[in-house]
Amino acid sequence: MAVLKAIKIEDRDGEILFRCPRCGMVFRSAKAYTRHVNKAHGHLFRK
């Protein structure tokens, strides 16, 4: 099974952001990142 691990980036305020390795979109929360991966890249995980 394929896994898309988020690239963690620290911004200038010290907040951790999540970047999608497949398309480069940036998210503030892990929940938003997970939702994006399931909706936009979910076809990679389904048969």
Swiss-Prot record:
SUPFAM superfamilies for this protein: beta-beta-alpha zinc fingers
Presence of keyword Ligase: no
Cofactor binding mode and count: Binds 1 zinc ion per subunit.
Pfam families linked to this entry: zf-C2H2
Keyword Zinc-finger recorded: yes
Chain sites annotated for binding Zn(2+): C20, C23, H36, H41
Zinc finger (C2H2-type): 18-41
Gene Ontology terms, MF aspect: zinc ion binding
Disulfide bonds: none
Obligatory cofactor(s): Zn(2+)
Highest taxon listed in the record's lineage: Archaea
This protein's UniProt keywords: Metal-binding, Zinc, Zinc-finger
Self-association state and partner proteins as the record states: Crystallized in association with 70S ribosomes.
Protein name: Zinc-finger protein TK0143
Organism: Thermococcus kodakarensis (strain ATCC BAA-918 / JCM 12380 / KOD1)
Upper classification of the organism: Archaea, Methanobacteriati, Methanobacteriota, Thermococci, Thermococcales
